[in-house]
């Protein structure tokens, strides 16, 4: 049985200390076993962005958003990736969605 939480934590640690390729390898392993793991998809998107693999970063980020369209972190990541890709219009659209999701989260936490 794959301990995806531990593996993702290991990958995040590798990423934090600059071992991007090691982090990517770990995350690909998790995604091969759990293709809809939003945490792994979100993390590998950031790793690919760091490696300047923009198309791959965008692809993994969009996969995370397919699983959870309202994932604020993924929407913000997508905006950053699109900016780096030179897609100003797409980045503005993603940024706008991120603001709306942020407000929704804020309102939800205020009403608790």
Predicted segments, located by residue:
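Alpha-helical segment of the N-proximal tetratricopeptide repeat
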Residues: 2-33
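Structural marker of alpha-solenoid helical repeat scaffolds
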Residues: 33, 67, 100-105
């Amino acid at each position: 049985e794959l301990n995806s939480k531990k593996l993702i934590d290991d990958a995040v640690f590798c990423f934090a200390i600059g071992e991007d390729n090691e982090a990517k390898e770990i995350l690909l392993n998790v995604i091969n076993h759990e293709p809809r793991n939003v945490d792994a998809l979100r993390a590998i998107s950031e790793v690919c962005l760091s490696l300047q693999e923009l198309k791959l970063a965008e692809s993994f980020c969009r996969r995370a958003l397919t699983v959870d369209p309202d994932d604020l972190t993924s929407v913000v990541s997508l905006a950053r990736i699109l900016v780096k890709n030179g897609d100003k219009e797409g980045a503005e659209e993603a940024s706008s969605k991120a603001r709306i999701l942020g407000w929704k989260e804020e309102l939800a936490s205020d009403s608790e």
